[in-house]
Amino acid sequence: MATFKLVISDPKSGIAKQVEITGAETEKLIGKRIGDQIPAKELNINLNELFGKEFPEDVKLEIRGGTDKDGFPMRPDIHGPRRVRVLLSKGPGFRPKEKGERRKKTVRGNTISPEIVQVNVKLVY
């Protein structure tokens, strides 16, 4: 059974909280992609208690990214749950030191699998 660290960010206040989920809640995340939205009720997360303020009941969590067990970041433009080496010039997983620099980097695809350890989500009201 997989265990995920869920980093929940509130874009209105700029606050981020970390929650660990296990069991049936993790099965609801496996197979989802970056950009998908999940109702917070499905994951049994009490956002009002976690953030200390009131949220509407229909609040959703939008998947924004994550990292796998070895620290490789997820990229929205690589499809599937696989790990690949790609030539990057910008974006998640690469910070160029010079203008126009490109380099091969190992990154993870955009689909959540049991190898993912951390999932970054943001609140969508």
From Swiss-Prot:
Location of the region described as Disordered in the Swiss-Prot/TrEMBL record: 90-109
Example GO biological process: translation
This protein's UniProt keywords: Ribonucleoprotein, Ribosomal protein
PROSITE patterns: RIBOSOMAL_S6E (PS00578)
Cellular component aspect of the GO annotation: ribonucleoprotein complex; ribosome
Molecular function via GO: structural constituent of ribosome
InterPro entries, sorted: Ribosomal_eS6, Ribosomal_eS6_arc, Ribosomal_eS6_CS
Pfam families registered for this protein in UniProt: Ribosomal_S6e (PF01092)
Highest taxon listed in the record's lineage: Archaea
NCBIfam families assigned to the protein according to its UniProt record, in alphabetical order: PRK04290.1-2, PRK04290.1-3
Subunit organization: Part of the 30S ribosomal subunit.
Family, similarity comment: Belongs to the eukaryotic ribosomal protein eS6 family.
This protein's name: Small ribosomal subunit protein eS6
Species of provenance: Pyrococcus furiosus (strain ATCC 43587 / DSM 3638 / JCM 8422 / Vc1)
